[in-house]
């Protein structure tokens, strides 16, 4: 009898827990994805803050030349970063208990791998939580689909690229200057500016900014005034009102005359789908581009593609970019190897008699 009562109480507790986790009445929705999201993001955030402030220098290139990244070791907010895990570790899973000591773990950049893996798991669960809440509220699933673009981008630079290059030391450092360093080195080694998927990403981000500004300014300029001239037009809106808050016909007419008729949407739903889909598709392509360049399927190479009748090279902008790439490659990891890979791969020229 006692065992039956205990089982019933246990079942009731589990049932109440499930109801609380999946309740849409909570101030913040938790959800089953949230059960995993909360501890992983808290872990990533906590370790990031501690390491950004106090982590000792990291031997990123595996050549016994540690690089300082934390505030207490001479950096500021701009130059500081979480230094990627050492090339000596490569792609090995490197939790604290795999190192001989905490000092060794810190020296080899263990915090970077810990932060990145927890962060990626956390943001993936955040995306799942968006879908879960949409499902419980009877909404369509496109919020999570849109969020998949930045999730894909983060996964590309923090996980796919290191896998393709063979080491977490090639991942993007977690800091402002570190991000710029990653971008410069990426251009030097992969010529990303000449990759069509990066071009699509630029069109997506800049185009999305343009379309967002156009839409916002058109709506703001065609509000249906519900207030006097002495009051803000924004005060005329009541949350949850059924009436349209702006005149889409007026906005359509204005924009159609400004450019041409069919450049303007006459369907609000199609318009907002376009506003969401354009930047999302662009960022998807960029993430795909990073993921292909991770395995050295690089940007277009038009070097020395124009020659005169005598076979002499006529430089184009592609050759100027190539010269800049070589310069950037020479500067980075200057003590890890004698020559950048492009120069080292060239066959030696015989100078004998």
Curated annotation (Swiss-Prot):
Pfam families assigned to the protein according to its UniProt record, in alphabetical order: Photo_RC
InterPro entries, per the entry: D1/D2, Photo_II_D1/D2_sf, Photo_RC_L/M, Photo_RC_L/M_CS, PSII_D1
Binding site for chlorophyll a PD1: 198
PTM comment text: Tyr-161 forms a radical intermediate that is referred to as redox-active TyrZ, YZ or Y-Z. C-terminally processed by CTPA; processing is essential to allow assembly of the oxygen-evolving complex and thus photosynthetic growth.
One term of GO molecular function: chlorophyll binding
Propeptide: 345-353
Keyword flag Cytoplasm: no
Cleavage, annotated site positions: 344-345
Positions that bind Fe cation: 215, 272
Reactions catalysed according to its record: 2 a plastoquinone + 4 hnu + 2 H2O = 2 a plastoquinol + O2
Known EC number: 1.10.3.9
Cellular compartment(s): Plastid, Chloroplast thylakoid membrane
Binding-site list for pheophytin a: 126
NCBIfam families per record: psbA
PANTHER family: PHOTOSYSTEM II D2 PROTEIN (PTHR33149:SF12), PHOTOSYSTEM II PROTEIN D1 (PTHR33149)
Annotated function: Photosystem II (PSII) is a light-driven water:plastoquinone oxidoreductase that uses light energy to abstract electrons from H(2)O, generating O(2) and a proton gradient subsequently used for ATP formation. It consists of a core antenna complex that captures photons, and an electron transfer chain that converts photonic excitation into a charge separation. The D1/D2 (PsbA/PsbD) reaction center heterodimer binds P680, the primary electron donor of PSII as well as several subsequent electron acceptors.
Family stated for the protein in its record: Belongs to the reaction center PufL/M/PsbA/D family.
Protein's recorded name: Photosystem II protein D1
Species, as recorded: Pinus koraiensis
Lineage of producing organism: Eukaryota, Viridiplantae, Streptophyta, Embryophyta, Tracheophyta
């Amino acid at each position: 009898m006692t065992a039956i009562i205990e089982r019933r109480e246990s079942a009731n507790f589990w049932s109440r827990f499930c109801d609380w986790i999946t309740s849409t009445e909570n101030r913040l929705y938790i959800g089953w994805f949230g059960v995993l999201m909360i501890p992983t993001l808290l872990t990533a955030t906590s370790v990031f803050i501690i390491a950004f402030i106090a982590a000792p220098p990291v031997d990123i290139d595996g050549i016994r030349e540690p690089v300082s990244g934390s505030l207490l070791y001479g950096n500021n907010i701009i130059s500081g970063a979480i230094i990627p895990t050492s090339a000596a570790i490569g792609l090995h899973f490197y939790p604290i208990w795999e190192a001989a000591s905490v000092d060794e773990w810190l020296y080899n950049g263990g915090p970077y791998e810990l932060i990145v893996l927890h962060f990626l798991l956390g943001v993936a669960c955040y995306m799942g939580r968006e879908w879960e809440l949409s499902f419980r509220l009877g909404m369509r699933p496109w919020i999570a689909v849109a969020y998949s673009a930045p999730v894909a981008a983060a996964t590309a630079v923090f996980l796919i690229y290191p896998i393709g290059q063979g080491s977490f030391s090639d991942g993007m450092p977690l800091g402002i200057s570190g991000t710029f360093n990653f971008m410069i080195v990426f251009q030097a080694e992969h010529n990303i500016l000449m990759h069509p998927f990066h071009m699509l990403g630029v069109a997506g981000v800049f185009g999305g900014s343009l379309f967002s500004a156009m839409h916002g300014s058109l709506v703001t300029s065609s509000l249906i005034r519900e207030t006097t001239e002495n009051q803000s037009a924004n005060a005329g809106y009541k949350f949850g009102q059924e009436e349209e808050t702006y005149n889409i016909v007026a906005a359509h007419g204005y924009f159609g005359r400004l450019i041409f008729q069919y450049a303007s949407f006459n369907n609000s739903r199609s318009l907002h789908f376009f506003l969401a889909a354009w930047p999302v598709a662009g960022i998807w392509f960029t993430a795909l581009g990073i993921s292909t360049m991770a395995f050295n399927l690089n940007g277009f190479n038009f070097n020395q593609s124009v020659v005169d009748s005598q076979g002499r090279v006529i430089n184009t902008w592609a050759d100027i970019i190539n010269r800049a790439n070589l310069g950037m490659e020479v500067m980075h990891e200057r003590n890890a190897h004698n020559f950048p890979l492009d120069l080292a791969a060239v066959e030696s020229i015989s100078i004998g008699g």
